[in-house]
Amino acid sequence: MDPRSEVLLRQRHLFATPLLLAGLPADDLLAELPQAQGWSWHAGEQAQLDARFPDRSRFDTRAPTGAWTSAVLFLPKSRELTDYLLASLAARLPGGELFLVGEKRGGIERASKQLAAYGKPRKLDSARHCQLWQVRIEQAPAEPDLHALAQRYSLPLADGELQVVSLPGVFSHGRLDRGSALLLGQLQALPGGHLLDFGCGAGVLGAVLKRRYPASRLTLLDVDAFAVESSRLTLAANGLDGEVIAADGIDGAPRELAAIVSNPPFHQGVHTDYQASERLLQRAAEHLAPGGELRLVANSFLKYPPLIERHLGPCRTLAEGDGFRIYSARRS
C-alpha cells in the first residue's frame, strides 16, 4: 500500500461518503474505500486500476462529474499542475471538503498553502513521512480553462519557427530542455516510414519530425494525459498531422517502426525512475522494422551503450554536449 494511502486510511471515517480520489496510486485504496471513484492522468496506473476496479477510475485531464461530497488530491510534482487540479476540484465542491495528501519530500508543507485560496487549511495527520491536509470550500472558483493555462512559446528553427504549447505538469513546462535541444540538431537522415516520438511531452520532437519528414507517418506516445493533450495542441498549432497516444512505455507502441526518436522519461512523481528508459532500450528491437533506428538523448553518466548493444545492435554516439549524449543504433 502506498504510504499516502495508508495516511488516508488512518482517517477513513472522513471518507465514508462519495468522494473523488485525484491522482490516486494503483494500490488497494479503492477496495478500502467503496464509496470512492478515481481520476488518473497516468496511463500505466489507470490500466492497473481498470484491471482491478472496472469503471471506478477515469483517465482524463479534466475532473469527472459526480455527486461528490469531498475529494482528495494526491500531490503531484508540479506546482502549476497542483494549482489547476485544486481549482478543478474546488469548483466541483462548493461547501464540500477538499483534502491534500503528499510526501514531505514532495513539498506537501509548501503545497498546503495553496489550499488557502479556498478556505482555512488544517493539518489532519502526519505519518509515514506524509501529511494529510483539509479545507472546507468557502470560496468555490469557476472551473479553470486548462487550455488558457498553457504556456506558448516559439522555437526558432532553420525551416521556420515552431509553435509549442505546454500544459501544466508537462516536462520542461514552457521551455525547451537541454537534452531535446541537443537532439533537435541530430535528426537528419532518419529512415523513411513510420516514426515514433517516445515520451513526447509537449510534442516538440514529434512536430519537428513531421515537418522534416512530411511523407512519414507520425505517432507520439506519452504516459501522461497532460503531455498527450499538449502534443495534440502543438501539432494543431503548426498545422501538422500525427497520432498521439497514451501508453505506459514502449510496450504500448506500434510495431514495424522506421525510427524511434526519444528524450526518454526518468521521473515518476518526485522519484527518479529509469525503468521506462531501460525498457525502451531492451524492447526497441521488437517495435522497429528491420533496419529501423533508435535515436535518443540521455545524460552522459548513464551507461546506456552496453544496454543498447546487448538488445539492439552497435551503438554510435552522434553528439555530446551540456551533459548529454545522442545515441543511435539500428536493428539488423
Curated annotation (Swiss-Prot):
Keyword S-adenosyl-L-methionine attributed: yes
Compartments where found: Cytoplasm
EC number of the protein: 2.1.1.172
Family: Belongs to the methyltransferase superfamily. RsmC family.
Top-level lineage group: Bacteria
Species name: Pseudomonas aeruginosa (strain UCBPP-PA14)
A GO CC term attached to the entry: cytoplasm
Function: Specifically methylates the guanine in position 1207 of 16S rRNA in the 30S particle.
Gene3D superfamilies assigned: Vaccinia Virus protein VP39
Any one GO molecular function term: nucleic acid binding
Subunit annotation: Monomer.
Principal EC category: transferase
Keywords from the named record: Cytoplasm, Methyltransferase, rRNA processing, S-adenosyl-L-methionine, Transferase
Major site of localization recorded for this protein: cytoplasm
Name of the protein in question: Ribosomal RNA small subunit methyltransferase C
Catalysed reactions, semicolon-separated: guanosine(1207) in 16S rRNA + S-adenosyl-L-methionine = N(2)-methylguanosine(1207) in 16S rRNA + S-adenosyl-L-homocysteine + H(+)
